[in-house]
Amino acid sequence: VNGYGTSNAARANPDVYFVHASGDGVLAGTAPANVANVMGRMEYGKMIAGCAAALQSETGNISYLGPLIDAETRRLVNSTYLGAKYCWTEVRGKPIEELNFKVTWIGFWFNIPGVTLDPTQVANDFINGGSDVIISGIDTTEALVEANKATAAGKKVFAIPYDYEAACEQAPEVCLGVPYFNWGPTYFELISAAQAGTFEQRWDWIAPDWSDINNPETSIVGFQKGAGLTAENAATLDNFIAMLADGSLNLYTGPLNYQDGTPFVAEGAVADDTTIWYTEQLLEGIEGQSAP
């Protein structure tokens, strides 16, 4: 469970309000009344990223540059894979056997020399292994940088960075887009509640503003399409986003199995929030570690 440190600090300071983004102490029932947990549903941003990758890939070899391994990062990788799988098979009509989706975890959200794997080396390993799209789950842009170098050297490689709205500006021609968090609206609401004396304990997992996922005033999660995405694929991606928005497409519909064959979502069932939040493994079809 995330949030023991926050909960302990909150108990020691009952007159102070605490906000733990990404935490789940409230969900688990371990947080005191002066704690709020909030998180954006980045799963949607990653589904969009996965779809963009599958639409643009010529080889079907898509790689994911992962940070550390926990429930959050597992569900983000799974969401990326589900988006890629849908757009590869249902939109492009290609066999699932031709989609190769691999994750390598570096061990943290950015490179720490001597501690993590080197994301530059991992990105190059992906490229040398035949991947033509690298999706980043780390906070820095090594995937984009190395895709750009490879493309300049004659290979066509695209990348999808993470969590910085303007990341594509570093190498626009190879950037398919970027999913990102926008915490401003939620923090404004929480601070306003604290000032008004109406702050309440809450665990909120907040969806994008589907009327405009890139509205900085309202949407906690966005996706900026990149210049590397063809016009046709960009239009197709917009249709995919619209299906997520209106609920006509729910990628967490069963049957879905974990890597070891354990049922994750039964046939005909739809995963609830708690099931997704506490994701225990990567999904069947993904190559890579589910646990450290």
Regions found by a protein language model. Give the residues of each.
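A residue-level marker of the well-folded mature domains of exported/periplasmic proteins
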Residues: V1-P292
